[in-house]
């Protein structure tokens, strides 16, 4: 997100005041720095003036250490990550200074208890920028850059951040086998290699470890693992056969194939936020409660995912939603990100409101607005200066539109896929304007239906010392 360079927080805590004095002493002396990568390896740097070095300058040192060309400068960004919070740094951020303010950021953007905050320490990661268009990835020629992107995508698959169907994660696991173990092993050697590295190195944790339960206990985990190994070996053999030609078996081709497969997941490249939503009221007492969700935001749209069940609850392109965030009005209230979208209730078209409770609502709202701006700029550039649409933007026929609509509706009804939205399982506020018809928000819903309808899309800065891009 963008922001001004004002003081953050308005009233600095005693901890931050005691720490900031050490920043000046770090300006001249050489210091060791560990920058972690998605595969848990680290780049060890010894740098002078670390205290006043911004992320852009630090990026040059990391790219040099990794032999990454400067042409890939926009692909990656620095992130501060911990179990409590993830933040993407802007090029002008001072990582050393921001690290000293970490506890202040946790108090502002998380509900973590004081004890957890006092013990939390972020790691500095070098990984994909949320603002890098996925279409550009497959144009990258450098194998080192593609391998870094592969490592990060694989991590998100294994950790369940990118929900996908069994046939999808099995194919991705087979591609990982081909990339990491090679394509020349016979079935016996491949099975032995998979067992040595363990299934959890290739398949999502919830798939490799199983969900447990009575039937799982009767069957035995060993038998289930053997079956999964056989399926993985079979799929790997299929992948290797389809890549039988020499060039297709090269690592760079397999890396591209893995990333291309990940691009089929709409939430690839998202920044992720923690939040909660209301559960639908159930039972005689209409008790609901809340459900933990992960909110992914990218250049493409917003995706709300069930943390426990590893599936999508709601996926919306920016053209399909309006949004806003609200601050607590009284003690005990929550920060809320509001999402508005079209839906149906008992066959009647309605507007639906989804409330996402999160202290990161302000960050989410700002990131959505910034992504909308970036898309608007890129679409304007693609339209041409004379106002004529390019071939890719030519109007489509009504027949094409109808087919597209039918295909989209069919996909949404395929609820056995974890990728499809489950709007029926959400507890939303439904309304119809004047009780008769929906007042559709145009153009492209690029402004909030609460406060921005009369204004063109603009980006509202979040007032912090170091403006934050959130992930």
Curated annotation (Swiss-Prot):
It is found in: Cytoplasm, Cytosol; Cell membrane. The gene is frmd8. Keywords: Cell membrane, Cytoplasm, Membrane. Promotes the cell surface stability of rhomboid 5 homologs and prevents their degradation via the endolysosomal pathway. By acting on rhomboid 5 homologs, involved in ADAM17-mediated ligand shedding. Negatively regulates the Wnt/beta-catenin signaling pathway. The lineage of its organism: Eukaryota, Metazoa, Chordata, Craniata, Vertebrata. It holds the Pfam family FERM_M. Residues 1-23, 381-416, 451-471 are annotated as: Disordered. PROSITE patterns: FERM_3 (PS50057). GO terms for cellular component: cytoskeleton; cytosol; plasma membrane. GO terms for biological process: anterior/posterior pattern specification; negative regulation of canonical Wnt signaling pathway; negative regulation of Wnt signaling pathway; regulation of canonical Wnt signaling pathway. Gene3D superfamilies: 1.20.80.10, Phosphatidylinositol 3-kinase Catalytic Subunit, Chain A, domain 1, Pleckstrin-homology domain (PH domain)/Phosphotyrosine-binding domain (PTB). This is FERM domain-containing protein 8. Residues 31-382 form the FERM domain. InterPro entries: Band_41_domain, FERM/acyl-CoA-bd_prot_sf, FERM_2, FERM_central, FERM_domain, KRIT1/FRMD8, PH-like_dom_sf. Transmembrane segments: none annotated.
């Amino acid at each position: 997100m963008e922001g001004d360079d004002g003081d953050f927080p308005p009233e600095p805590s005693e901890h931050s005041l005691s720490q900031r004095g050490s920043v000046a002493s770090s300006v001249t002396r050489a210091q060791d720095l560990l920058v972690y990568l998605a595969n848990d390896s680290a780049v060890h740097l010894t740098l002078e003036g670390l205290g006043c070095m911004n992320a852009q300058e630090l990026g040059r040192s990391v790219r040099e250490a990794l032999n990454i060309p400067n042409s890939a400068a926009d692909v990656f960004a620095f992130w501060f990550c911990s179990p409590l919070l993830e933040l993407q740094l802007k090029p002008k951020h001072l990582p050393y200074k921001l690290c000293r303010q970490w506890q202040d950021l946790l108090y502002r953007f998380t509900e973590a208890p004081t004890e957890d905050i006092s013990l939390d320490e972020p790691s500095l990661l070098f990984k994909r920028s949320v603002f890098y268009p996925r279409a550009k990835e497959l144009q990258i020629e450098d194998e080192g850059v593609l391998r870094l992107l592969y490592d990060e995508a694989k991590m998100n698959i294994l950790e369940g951040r990118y929900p996908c169907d069994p046939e999808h994660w099995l194919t991705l696991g087979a591609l990982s086998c081909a990339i990491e173990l090679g394509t020349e092993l016979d079935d016996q050697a491949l099975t032995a290699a998979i067992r040595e590295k363990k299934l959890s190195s290739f398949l999502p944790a919830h798939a490799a470890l199983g969900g447990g339960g009575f039937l799982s206990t009767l069957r035995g985990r060993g038998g289930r693992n053997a079956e999964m190994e056989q399926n993985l070996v079979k799929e790997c053999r299929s992948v290797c056969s389809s890549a039988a030609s020499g060039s297709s078996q090269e690592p760079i081709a397999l890396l591209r194939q893995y990333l291309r497969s990940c691009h089929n997941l709409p939430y690839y490249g998202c920044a992720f936020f923690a939040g909660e939503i209301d559960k639908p009221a159930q039972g005689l007492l209409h008790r609901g409660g809340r459900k933990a969700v992960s909110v992914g935001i990218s250049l493409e749209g917003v995706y709300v995912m069930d943390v426990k069940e590893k599936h999508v609850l709601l996926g919306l392109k920016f053209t399909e939603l309006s949004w806003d965030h609200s601050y607590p009005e009284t003690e005990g209230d929550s920060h809320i990100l509001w999402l508005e979208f079209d839906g149906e209730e008992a066959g009647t078209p309605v507007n639906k409101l989804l409330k996402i409770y999160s202290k990161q609502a302000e960050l989410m709202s700002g990131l959505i607005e910034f992504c909308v701006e970036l898309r608007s700029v890129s679409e304007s550039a693609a339209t041409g200066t004379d106002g004529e649409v390019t071939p890719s933007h030519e109007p489509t026929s009504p027949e094409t539109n109808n087919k597209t609509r039918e295909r989209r509706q069919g996909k949404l009804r395929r609820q056995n896929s974890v990728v499809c939205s489950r709007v029926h399982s959400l507890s939303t506020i439904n309304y119809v304007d004047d009780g008769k018809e929906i007042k559709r928000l145009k153009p492209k819903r690029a402004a909030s239906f609460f406060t921005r309808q009369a204004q063109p899309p603009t980006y509202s800065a979040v007032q912090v010392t170091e403006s934050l891009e959130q992930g």
